[in-house]
Amino acid sequence: MTFKVAAAPISWGVSEVPGWGRILEPERVLSEMAGLGVHATELGPPGYLPDPPTIIGRNGLELVGGFLAVPMHDASAAEGSVAEASATAKKIAAGGGEIVVLAAATGLDGYDGRPQLDDAQWATLIDTCRRITEVVTAEGLRVAMHPHVGTHVETEAEIERFLADSPMPLCLDTGHLLVGGTDPVALAERHPTRIGHLHLKDVRADLAAEVRAGRVGFADAVARGLFVPLGDGDVDTEAMVRSVHAAGYHGWYVLEQDTALGPDSDDCGPRRNTARSLVHLDEVFSRIREGR
């Protein structure tokens, strides 16, 4: 029984959000992943790995896929979003990856503001997803929608509406789902056939509630420690892994801990936190393998 584990640059503070924090060099991030025994990674934000096959292969890693947040609800921007998805898919395919992880961006910087969509904008979003699916699958890749804080597919109601209106599978991100007010395990059990990809995160429920209530912005919450190593927060990682495994999921378990590095942050922190998460995840996998 094999569980495929990958990491992602966001655990080292590498984000597409302007002003997010200090960005560590790719060689350091990838070499630390490899040093922890992780053999696969997602791409990171656009431009972070300009030549994925070379730099990832040099560190003994394989490419899983990449995250892409683009506006899909605005008819005037849809063409550009489809083109960006096509370019991203080509880069991932060239690097040997298999999936584009899509998020329905608002068009604003960051994830702190989220205008509501009317029915026409929602219909455009769904149609843009269809068009993006076409260009991504043309490259031999899969695509999955990532419900994400501060996007147009965030809340439980929006996720259910999306599943009803689009055949696209989901990337279940345990942290973003919980922050957005969705029980990730319950969602996986309701829709076992729609699980396309998995991001394993853990979060503090107290800070998640503050974000949900609008009292704390997402970026501020991240800086205050919203995301923690697996097993240290309020997500039931083991229940999630057991649920998707029972549903027949054989894809990647991508370990993530959204992190922002300030001027005085300890650059060794991401490696230590990822190591702790890996220990917890390995214990979960061991119990499942042993039938416990």
Give the positions of each predicted feature:
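Acidic/histidine-rich catalytic cores of soluble enzymes
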Residues: 7, 127-234, 285-288, 292
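Structural preference for beta-strand elements that scaffold enzyme active sites
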Residues: 2-9, 40, 62-67, 98-101, ...
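C-terminal helical cap(s) of enzyme catalytic domains, especially alpha/beta-barrels
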Residues: 265-290
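Conserved, mostly hydrophobic/aromatic
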Residues: 7, 33, 41, 56, ...
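Acidic-and-aromatic substrate-binding clefts and catalytic sites of carbohydrate-active enzymes
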Residues: 40-52, 71-82, 149-154, 176-182, ...
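Acidic (Asp/Glu)-rich catalytic clusters
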Residues: 1-2, 30-35, 48-65, 83-97, ...
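Active-site mouth loops of central-metabolism enzymes
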Residues: 11-25, 71-81, 114-121, 229-231
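Active-site acidic/histidine proton-transfer and metal-coordination neighborhood
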Residues: 58, 77-171, 179, 272
